[in-house]
């Protein structure tokens, strides 16, 4: 059976970036999130999952 390559994941920025590490701010920007409560629908890939794991305390993930 072939893998479903169209899987996506919704990511929402739920906490502000003040007081966070610069690496984490860059990870949030790489996910395409700019302002509080921004939502992006991204392709579910290991790279995106790694960025989400880095900033798990700032974002909310909806499968």
UniProtKB/Swiss-Prot annotation:
The keyword Ribonucleoprotein applies. One of its GO terms (biological process) is translation. CDD domains: Ribosomal_L30_like. SUPFAM superfamilies: Ribosomal protein L30p/L7e (SSF55129). The keyword Ribonucleoprotein applies. Keywords: Ribonucleoprotein, Ribosomal protein. One of its GO terms (molecular function) is structural constituent of ribosome. One of its GO terms (cellular component) is cytosolic large ribosomal subunit. Coiled coil: none annotated. Belongs to the universal ribosomal protein uL30 family. Part of the 50S ribosomal subunit. This is Large ribosomal subunit protein uL30. It comes from Xanthomonas oryzae pv. oryzae (strain KACC10331 / KXO85).
């Amino acid at each position: 059976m072939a893998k479903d390559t169209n899987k996506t994941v919704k990511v929402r920025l739920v906490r502000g970036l003040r007081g966070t590490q610069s690496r984490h701010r860059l990870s949030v920007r790489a996910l395409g999130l700019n302002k509080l409560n921004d939502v992006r629908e991204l392709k579910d890939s290991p790279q995106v999952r790694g960025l989400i794991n880095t900033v798990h305390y700032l974002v909310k993930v909806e499968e």
